[in-house]
Structure formats: structure tokens, C-alpha cells
């Protein structure tokens, strides 16, 4: 799996904003990882990124890069409606693959990717990094010490009142984050979905709420709104005699046995860093993928798991369609 120097060799497709903000710095921080080559059709972005990370091998064609470099894994970070064909090609070559969310923009995309990954034995990861934020991971573990999660809540609000006219809708852009975070917090499999959605002042759906029932008895509640006055992403986790409330990029408080003061933790202090890619969970998500490459195992957000998040998202949208919304 690794090169002669023991490092995992990674080939990067894409040198855009997201990659440069969180994935390149995460990978560059790992002593056992080599960014072996970079590909981008924008020559200036390619030059700037490759120079910053001292990467000699630079390509405009991803197929040529993968064939010549023969990496241990490919990172293909870009818009899902543009990158879907790149992802399928990589999987058909048997390449281990890391992508950003969403896992395509339709359930057909997601199921096809999961099928190809399983068929070709690829180790994959969708970057649902809110599962691995150090602060929330710490609070989640503390709750589980008291017993299974009874119920969890995820709120994701933004102030974005204009019509959303991208290739993907609000659900696939942001809603999947809330669904996936709830799935991780609650554990188990979603067995029932009850939803209410709205169109508030725009032609597209910009309000989602759903109650998710899990086969382990846990209940998850998500509320996503782009009609709010500010951005919020926060969670609650409740287990017997304990609860946690947290904003991934701010603070989290743990309450035990009726205490109303709680113990508050700062996300940067828990992560031990002021770097966004670290306290935001991206470094941990990348580390999980690299470790699984070395061990030959599947990480938590492999395509076979991430497709379940997409299925819940499509269920909510289907319920809206059946209601005539």
C-alpha cells in the first residue's frame, strides 16, 4: 500500500478553495503521507497549490496522472455534478477514493458510487467531518459512558433568502450534513422518517424538519432552515442522566444528573489548535482515511455507509413530493 519510504502516496484532483482550506493542510501535516501529484484544469490554481506544497508532478488530465503515478489513493474534491464521472472512473480503476459531500446529487449517483466501490474493493470516504470534530466527539463519548443515546437534535440554520439555483438543492448541499450527524450521534439504522418541509418566499424548498426513528430505539430530530436570521450549526445529545449541547466551531457544555451549570469546553482548546481544518474535524476525518488505507479497512463514512444518509435525504424529499410541496 505504501511507497518505499513507508508513506501513503496520494494523488489530488482539484486545487480549489475547499481543498486548499482543509484537505491539503490536513494531508501535509501527516508525516506518513506524500502528496505525490496534483491535477487541475486551472493552470494558475495548479501552480499556486503545487508550489505551496512542493509537489513536482503536475497534471491537467486526471487519467494520465492516475495511470502514471499509480497512487495509493485519490482525492477528488469538487462540485458533485462535475466530478461524478471522475469518481466513477477512479472506482472502475480500483482506486481508493476520498470525496467531499454530497455523494452525487441524486440517489442514483450515490447508489452507483457505493456499488462501484464494493465491486472493485475500494476504500472510500465521504468527508462528513462533523462526525470527527474533536469537541463533539469528546462530548459524544462522555454521553455514551452513561448509556445509549436516547435522543439527539441537530439544527442547521442560515440566512439565505434568495432562490437556490445550483445543480444540487439545499437538501443535498447542507441537509445531508444534519442527517449524517444525527445518524452518527444516534447510532443504529433509520427505520422511519416523519418530515415537514416548506418553501418560504422562494420556488425551492428552504425549510426541512424531520424526526428520525432508529432501530436501536434512539430518536433524532433535525431542523434545517435557510430562512433564519443567522447561521447556526449545533447539536444536542441525551443519554440517561446526561446531555451535551454544542456548536462544532464554538463551545460545548456537558450536563450531568440535573446540574444546571454544566462544564463548558472550547472547540479550539479540545482540538489543541486554532487551525480550522483541525478543530473543524477535517484533519481527523482525513487521518481516519489514511489509517484505514494502511490497515485495509473501511472508515466510518465509506460509500456504503454514506449512501444511507442520501437515502434519508431522498425520503424526506419524496415525502414532500407526495404531499404536493
Model-derived regions, located:
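C-terminal helix-rich "cap/oligomerization" subdomain common to oxidoreductases
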Residues: 1-7, 73-75, 122, 215, ...
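A contiguous active-site-proximal alpha/beta segment in oxidoreductase catalytic domains
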Residues: 81, 104-162
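Hydrophobic residues in well-ordered beta-strands that form the structural core
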Residues: 19, 99, 124-126, 153, ...
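Beta-loop-alpha module in the N-terminal Rossmann-like domain of NAD(P)-dependent dehydrogenases
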Residues: 42, 53, 57-116
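Active-site loop of classical SDR/Rossmann-like NAD(P)-dependent oxidoreductases
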Residues: 18, 273-287, 301
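Contiguous beta-strand/loop segments that form the cofactor/metal-binding neighborhood of enzyme cores
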Residues: 179-253, 279, 283-297
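Oxidoreductase and adenylate-handling cofactor-binding alpha/beta cores
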Residues: 132-153, 172-198, 211-218, 319
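N-terminal Rossmann-like dinucleotide-binding module
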Residues: 1-53
Amino acid at each position: 500500500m505504501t511507497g518505499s519510504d513507508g508513506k501513503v502516496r496520494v494523488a489530488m484532483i482539484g486545487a480549489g478553495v475547499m481543498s486548499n482550506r482543509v484537505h491539503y493542510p490536513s494531508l501535509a501535516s501527516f508525516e506518513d503521507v506524500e502528496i505525490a501529484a496534483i491535477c487541475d484544469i486551472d493552470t494558475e490554481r495548479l501552480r499556486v497549490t503545487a508550489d505551496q506544497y512542493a509537489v513536482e508532478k503536475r497534471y491537467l488530465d486526471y487519467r494520465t496522472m492516475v495511470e502514471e503515478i499509480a497512487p495509493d489513493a485519490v482525492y477528488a474534491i469538487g462540485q458533485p455534478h462535475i466530478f461524478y464521472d471522475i469518481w466513477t472512473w477512479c472506482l472502475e480503476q480500483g482506486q481508493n477514493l476520498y470525496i467531499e459531500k454530497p455523494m452525487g446529487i441524486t440517489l442514483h449517483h450515490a447508489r452507483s458510487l457505493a456499488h462501484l466501490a464494493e465491486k472493485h474493493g475500494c476504500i472510500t470516504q465521504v468527508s462528513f467531518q462533523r462526525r470527527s470534530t474533536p469537541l463533539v466527539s469528546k462530548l459524544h463519548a462522555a454521553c455514551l459512558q452513561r448509556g445509549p443515546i436516547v435522543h439527539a437534535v441537530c439544527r442547521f440554520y442560515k440566512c439565505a433568502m434568495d432562490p437556490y439555483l445550483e445543480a444540487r438543492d439545499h437538501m443535498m448541499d447542507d441537509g445531508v450534513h444534519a442527517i449524517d450527524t444525527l445518524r452518527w450521534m444516534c447510532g443504529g439504522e433509520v427505520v422511519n422518517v416523519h418530515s415537514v418541509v416548506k418553501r418560504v418566499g422562494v420556488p425551492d424548498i428552504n425549510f426541512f424538519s424531520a424526526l428520525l426513528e432508529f432501530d436501536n430505539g434512539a430518536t433524532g430530530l433535525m431542523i434545517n432552515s435557510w430562512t433564519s436570521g443567522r447561521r447556526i450549526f449545533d447539536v444536542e445529545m441525551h443519554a440517561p442522566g446526561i446531555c451535551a449541547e454544542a456548536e462544532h466551531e464554538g463551545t460545548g457544555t456537558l450536563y450531568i444528573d440535573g446540574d444546571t451549570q454544566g462544564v463548558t469546553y472550547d472547540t479550539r482548546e479540545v482540538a489543541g489548535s486554532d487551525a480550522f481544518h483541525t478543530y473543524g474535524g477535517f484533519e481527523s476525518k482525513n487521518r481516519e482515511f489514511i489509517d484505514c488505507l494502511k490497515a485495509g479497512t473501511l472508515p466510518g463514512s465509506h460509500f456504503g455507509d454514506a449512501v444511507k444518509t442520501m437515502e434519508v435525504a431522498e425520503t424526506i424529499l419524496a415525502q414532500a413530493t407526495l404531499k404536493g410541496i
